[in-house]
């Protein structure tokens, strides 16, 4: 169509609407899934009007059907129900409005819903959205708590009352939203994103007081699960539910079984904390007292030792021992010196008695030839040979006379 138009040769609105209607007619009948809203069954009217909505994308389309088509499922289908309709798209050219004319309506059973949720759960788990490593720790004492819940609901009352009872100073930033029906998902997602964007919000609680599987479907919506996974603020899921667990429980940083349980897990009890501090203080006091008493006993035992009790006595005892040993040493050394002196004198006397000088003193002389050899026999000398004679008091020369 674009090739056949220009600013100079535009198509009239009616022609464009006619072309769109032709394309829609060629689409034929299709099966469409959605959630029923704005159901209108006027008494006596042969046509039923409703809106079929996709809560994940907040897109709606009008649906009409004959009364007998709706009456076939009227007992199990009402506003908020998820259904599959076999319908033919219709284009109302005067208003440029798309609608569906349903020929068959089938409610989606609980079993089928749970099967779809299980498939979605596996898909999201495969992306790693539920792993423990992604979980963020909650602050010990949050100053400001974001609360997403229904307006004037029991869930809101339970969280606020229990939290303030445990810690009166805690503050809340409450976002009241639809917690079931077609508007629940976009409102809850928007509230979570708004609270996560605030730097002063320490933790976010998403609370609802339970319900059927159909009522809790918004808390298993993929859009909400991904929004919570993207939060930088810790998120607590507090959906009081049946055994079938909403997917919000898996992606949240902490799961609480009920709104009351969420208040207890998020906010510490001031009384319990004061008692815990008191108990720790008493325990510390007992530990310190025990250490002091043990050290005092050790010190008393040490002071009771003789060396510490009367240190001078030990010194005096050792001084007497030193004096006794010193005197003993002197006596022993004196005896040794006296004996050594006596032995030395005796040895000296023997040496003197046996020395040549002693012999000379008795009148003997030593004759030596000129070469210094001592004369021992007469035949060792010749006539007129000069010899040197050594006596006790000196020496002189003699001549041999044969």
Swiss-Prot record:
Pfam families: Exonuc_VII_L, tRNA_anti_2. Keywords: Cytoplasm, Exonuclease, Hydrolase, Nuclease. One of its GO terms (cellular component) is cytoplasm. GO terms for molecular function: exodeoxyribonuclease VII activity; nucleic acid binding. Belongs to the XseA family. This is Exodeoxyribonuclease 7 large subunit. It comes from Streptomyces avermitilis (strain ATCC 31267 / DSM 46492 / JCM 5070 / NBRC 14893 / NCIMB 12804 / NRRL 8165 / MA-4680). InterPro entries: Exonuc_VII_L (IPR003753), Exonuc_VII_lsu_C (IPR020579), OB-fold_nuc-bd_dom (IPR025824). Its EC number is 3.1.11.6. It is found in: Cytoplasm. It comes from the Bacteria. Heterooligomer composed of large and small subunits. One of its GO terms (biological process) is DNA catabolic process. It catalyses: Exonucleolytic cleavage in either 5'- to 3'- or 3'- to 5'-direction to yield nucleoside 5'-phosphates. Bidirectionally degrades single-stranded DNA into large acid-insoluble oligonucleotides, which are then degraded further into small acid-soluble oligonucleotides.
């Amino acid at each position: 169509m674009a090739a056949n138009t220009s600013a100079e040769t535009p198509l009239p609105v009616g022609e464009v609407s006619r072309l769109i209607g032709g394309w829609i007619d060629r689409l034929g009948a299709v099966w469409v899934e959605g959630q029923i809203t704005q159901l209108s069954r006027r008494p006596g009217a042969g046509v039923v009007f409703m809106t079929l909505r996709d809560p994940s994308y907040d897109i709606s389309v009008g649906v009409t059907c004959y009364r007998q088509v709706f009456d076939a499922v009227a007992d199990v289908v009402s506003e908020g129900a998820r259904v599959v309709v076999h319908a033919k798209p219709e284009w109302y050219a005067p208003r440029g409005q798309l609608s569906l004319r349903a020929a068959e309506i089938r409610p989606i059973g609980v079993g089928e819903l749970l099967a779809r949720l299980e498939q979605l759960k596996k898909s999201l788990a495969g992306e790693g959205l539920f792993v423990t490593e992604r979980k963020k720790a909650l602050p010990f004492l949050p100053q400001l708590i974001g609360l997403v819940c229904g307006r004037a609901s029991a869930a809101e009352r339970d969280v606020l009352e229990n939290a303030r009872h445990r810690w009166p100073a805690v503050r809340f930033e409450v976002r009241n939203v639809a917690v079931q029906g077609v508007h629940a998902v976009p409102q809850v997602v928007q509230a979570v994103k708004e609270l996560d964007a605030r730097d002063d919000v320490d933790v976010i609680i998403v609370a609802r007081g339970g319900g059927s599987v159909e009522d809790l479907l918004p808390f298993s919506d993929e859009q909400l699960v991904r929004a919570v996974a993207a939060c930088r603020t810790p998120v607590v899921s507090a959906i009081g539910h049946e055994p079938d667990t909403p997917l919000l429980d898996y992606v949240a940083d902490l799961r609480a079984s009920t709104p009351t349980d969420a208040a207890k897990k998020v906010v510490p009890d001031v009384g319990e904390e004061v008692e815990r501090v008191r108990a720790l203080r008493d325990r510390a006091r007992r530990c310190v007292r025990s250490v002091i008493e043990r050290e005092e006993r050790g010190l008393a035992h040490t002071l009771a030792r003789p060396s510490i009790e009367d240190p001078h006595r030990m010194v005096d005892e050792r001084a007497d021992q030193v004096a006794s040993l010193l005197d003993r040493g002197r006596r022993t050394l004196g005896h040794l010196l006296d004996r050594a002196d006596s032995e030395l004198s005796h040895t000296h006397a023997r040496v003197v008695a046996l020395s040549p000088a002693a012999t000379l003193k008795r009148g003997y002389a030593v004759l030596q030839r000129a070469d210094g050899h001592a004369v021992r026999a007469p035949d060792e000398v010749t006539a007129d040979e000069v010899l040197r004679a050594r006596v006790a008091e000196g020496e002189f020369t003699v001549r041999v006379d044969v």
